[in-house]
UniProtKB/Swiss-Prot annotation:
SMART domains: TPR (SM00028). This is Peroxisomal targeting signal receptor 9. The lineage of its organism: Eukaryota, Fungi, Dikarya, Ascomycota, Saccharomycotina. Peroxisomal import receptor that mediates the peroxisomal import of both malate synthases MLS1 and MLS2 in oleate-grown cells. Recognizes the C-terminal peroxisomal targeting signal PTS1 sequence SKL of MLS1 and MLS2, probably via its TPR domains. Interacts with the PTS1-receptor docking protein PEX14 but not with peroxins PEX1, PEX3 through to PEX8, PEX10, PEX11, PEX12, PEX13, PEX15, PEX17, PEX18, PEX19 and PEX21. Belongs to the peroxisomal targeting signal receptor family.
Length: 514
């Protein structure tokens, strides 16, 4: 709203009073834009070197890893960077390290700064300015000091009243105005979906097996699961195979281990944690389970538990080097270590000339410890070393994309995620990370497509009802559709009354997208 000035000629005393009041109506209804200058500093030469050297013997084409430039304001469709910075890219749930809102899995769209607001929104903020009391005591407080029969007021009251009416007319919005293009009717739905946690049951204390399992009668379902995993089959089928193996032999350590890892990769956090805990109950020093469970706790912002697990991982993996002294009790071993102390131990191990395989494991853990300690460059160097040594490891590409995304280098992060997706097409987690990166970049159409892929991948082979499908993926899909103003697709999703129709609707929406 433009600043309103009162033009009164002569040396009228009311003119002086009015000027003294300094009416600044432009402060009413003015909103600030949040702007964040993305840090896009990337070492292009290092990245190009990685991509150049990692292609040897690989059929996958070279990806141009360029430094991410700050996205143009027009590409954001009005969604502020500050809103989406709360979003857990989740470290692809591989490692999100800084404390954040635990509900940040759901991304919040915002309004364009030039969008018109509906009459209800206007009345909420400006209704107070219509009241007579406000007009007398706020707009022109000097009126209460003048009697109606004052000789001063009789001369200018008419002109004063006309200016006041003009001012109120500028504030006034007709009640019958409809702003259908903005889509505020969907904001209420967004407010319902943003807090989806109430729809989720409490975390179970025991692993939740599928009720129906096609592999339960097979002779060796564990072997079937390993073959499915190696061949890049749908992760739901891999989960069923390992669950069948455990049903036949509850003490199968490797089945529990692989089941936990696959559940994490399929974005089933609670079952993944429970499976790995069962593995550790059977084999307390299983280093693979310790590492993956430690990473999971970092994702859950439980840093103290993750540090305990990393400490135990070091003692278990390098037991010949670190042998507890006779006076060292269990309490001292379980004491929470400092990140810097653990990193120093691992750095010392690297200088001892250990085996190559152990070096890879140390660099993997160091990359996580460095990042959680906000040492971004050191973390990147660890991952870059691993990529040079293992260019076809999809998990490392996923983690590398995650660290780039958390430094807001979204273009480079998307390239890394796509590399991982090429190597592991069944990796549900990397598709979800891609969706989050696209949303942070402001590309809501691609984000919507990737979220639909995630939902369809996770629904394959499972018996779902519609209520169970209202998870964080569906909520983020709805928010992406709202942000892109694709309200027709949102209506189609809301109009699906059962799982079959919902899946068919999602496929139809996906095929219509550019």
């Amino acid at each position: 709203m433009n600043e309103v000035t009162c033009s009164i000629t002569g040396d009228n005393p009311i003119h002086k009073i009015n000027n003294g009041l300094g009416l600044k109506w432009n402060n009413l209804g003015k909103f600030s834009d949040f702007q964040t200058n993305d840090s896009a500093a990337r070492d292009a030469r290092t990245i190009d070197y990685i991509f150049t050297n990692c292609q040897t013997g690989s059929s996958i084409g070279k990806i141009d890893f360029r430094a991410a430039l700050p996205a143009d304001k027009s590409q954001h469709s009005g969604v502020s960077e500050k809103e989406f910075s709360r979003l857990e890219n989740q470290w692809s749930k591989e490692f999100s390290c800084f404390p954040k809102n635990k509900n940040a899995d759901v991304t919040k769209p915002s309004r364009n700064k030039h969008e018109k607001r509906s009459a209800n929104l206007h009345n909420r903020y400006f209704a107070q300015y219509y009241s007579t009391a406000y007009q007398q005591n706020r707009i022109y407080p000097c009126r209460i000091s003048y009697n109606e029969h004052s000789s001063v007021s009789n001369g200018w009251e008419f002109q004063f009243k006309s200016i006041e009416n003009q001012l109120l007319n500028e504030l006034k919005i007709e009640n019958n105005v409809e702003e259908k293009t903005v889509g505020y009717e969907y904001v209420a739905e967004y407010e319902e979906t943003i807090d989806f946690m109430h729809m989720l049951s409490s975390v179970p204390q025991t692993y939740q097996f599928l009720k129906s399992n096609i592999y339960i009668t097979e002779r060796d379902p564990y072997k079937i699961g390993c073959v499915l995993m190696d061949n890049g089959s749908n992760l739901n089928e891999v989960v069923m195979a390992f669950e069948a193996a455990i049903s036949q032999d509850p003490s199968h350590i490797n089945a529990w281990l692989k089941l936990g890892i696959v559940n994490f990769e399929n974005e089933s956090e609670s079952n993944g944690e429970l499976a790995l805990r069962n593995c550790l109950n059977l084999d307390p020093n299983n280093t693979i389970a310790l590492e993956n469970l430690a990473i999971h706790h970092i994702n859950q912002q439980n840093e103290s538990e993750s540090l305990k697990l990393f400490h135990k991982w070091i003692l278990s993996k390098f037991s010949k080097v670190f042998q507890p002294s006779a006076g060292e009790n269990k309490d001292s071993i379980n004491k929470i270590p400092k990140k810097a102390h653990l990193a120093h131990i691992l750095e010392s191990l690297l200088n001892m000339g250990i085996e190559k395989k152990d070096q890879y494991d140390i660099y993997s853990v160091l990359s996580i410890l460095y990042y959680s300690d906000q040492k971004i460059k050191q973390s990147q160097k660890c991952l870059e070393f691993l990529l040079l040594e293992k260019p076809n490891n999809g998990t490392i590409w996923n983690r590398y994309g995650a660290i780039l995304a958390n430094t807001k280098s979204y273009h480079s992060a998307i390239n890394a995620y796509n590399k991982c997706k090429q190597l592991r097409p069944n990796f549900t987690r990397v598709r979800y990370n891609l969706a989050i990166a696209y949303m942070n970049k402001g590309d809501y159409v691609k984000a919507s497509k990737m979220l639909i892929e995630v939902i369809l991948l996770r629904s394959k082979g499972y018996e779902h009802n519609k209520a169970k499908m209202q998870n964080k993926f569906m909520q983020n899909l709805k928010n992406a559709l709202i942000a892109s103003k694709n309200f027709d697709s949102l209506d189609l999703i809301n109009g699906s009354h059962n799982t079959e129709s919902l899946i068919s609707t999602l496929k139809a929406i996906y095929n219509k997208m550019d």
